[in-house]
Amino acid sequence: MFKLLKIENARMNVPEPVFHEATTAEAISIGEALVLTNGKLTKCAATATPQFIAIGQVGASDANRKVAVCRVESNQVYEVPVTAAPTSLKVGDKVTIHTDGLQVTATTTSGVITIENLNGASAAGDTIVVRI
């Protein structure tokens, strides 16, 4: 999951929550990368730039579809797991988002998430520091 690590040059390290409706029959998890499509939140595609990170959750069959999210801003830095061993990755590489919207891949072709720090990551599931 995308976990906010810090907001650079901000007096408070807490993003302002906003609420949007989730796409019908789609579950959303805390820390998931999201975009608005047709006015509703949906999982971010691998090579799309996330607009929001979920700070609330909703089940696929929940009647209340409103989800708390924070807007993605350029001064935010996140920790996120990588789905494959990041052995060939370097700081500054751009990687894609995994299909679950909660992790990044080690794929740099058409990447949208910039690596800020590898944090000593050497295996799948290890956490790296990124900027969106």
Where are each of the predicted segments found?
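Surface-exposed, low-hydrophobicity beta-strand/loop segments enriched in small/polar/acidic residues
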Residues: M1-I132
